[in-house]
Regions:
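Histidine-centered catalytic micro-motifs
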Residues: 58-66, 138-141
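Double-stranded beta-helix
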Residues: 80-138, 162
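Non-heme Fe(II)-dependent double-stranded beta-helix
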Residues: 1-61
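Short proline/glycine-enriched turn/loop segments at secondary-structure junctions
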Residues: 142-146
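Short, structured patches in soluble enzyme cores that scaffold and shape functional sites
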Residues: 46, 73-77, 89
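A short hydrophobic beta-strand segment most commonly corresponding to one strand
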Residues: 147-163
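Short, conserved beta-strand element in jelly-roll/cupin
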Residues: 64-80, 124-125, 156-158
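Conserved hydrophobic/aromatic beta-strand scaffold that supports enzyme active sites
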Residues: 60, 70-74, 120-122, 130-132, ...
Length: 164
């Protein structure tokens, strides 16, 4: 085995230990109130201020049509302007979803306009900071405005559609 492959194997063994951790599995299962959950995606996402289209998902405020519990772990420090994940505040989000329900539009619409920036909050933090959130809340990937590059380990969990 090459040294490079050996390093990758050690890395994936570590991730396997993390994501097969009984406490993490129990947390996700309790959150969804079922044992029929899965990790549907694990990937690294790097963003910078050059060449990225920011007028499309995931850079627009939205909520996911499929419900996930997402884990976003910053692998680099994320300060203001570095593209931290951004959320609508609870009161505004609840009001928005009630309006969509009244119009019976919740299934069709998932991109929303936020004109009042006081109703959103960007999550910043040092590397290792984790944002864990239900995608029923309005959110977006933050736009990188600085010269830094945001690097995030993202893990999406959900109810396994094949078992539910």
């Amino acid at each position: 085995m090459t040294e490079e492959l050996s390093t990758k194997v050690r890395y994936f063994k570590y991730l396997n230990e993390v994501f097969n951790n009984s406490n993490l599995s129990e947390f996700v299962n309790e959150y969804f109130e079922t044992k029929d959950t899965e990790i549907s995606k694990i990937f690294l996402a790097e963003s910078s201020n050059s060449g990225e289209k920011v007028d499309v998902l995931p850079y627009k405020m939205h909520f996911d049509k499929t419900r996930y519990l997402k884990f976003m772990i910053y692998l680099r420090n994320v300060s203001e302007g570095d593209g931290g994940v951004t959320f609508a505040k609870k009161e505004w989000n609840t009001k928005l979803q009630q309006e969509l329900l009244e119009r019976e539009a919740l299934q069709e619409e998932n991109v929303v306009e936020v004109n009042d920036l006081s109703q959103i909050e960007e999550i910043t933090g040092s590397k290792g900071t984790a944002a864990i959130f239900d995608t029923n809340i309005t959110h977006k990937a933050g736009q990188v405005l600085s010269q830094n590059k945001r690097l995030v380990l993202r893990v999406d969990t959900r109810i396994n559609p094949e078992l539910s």
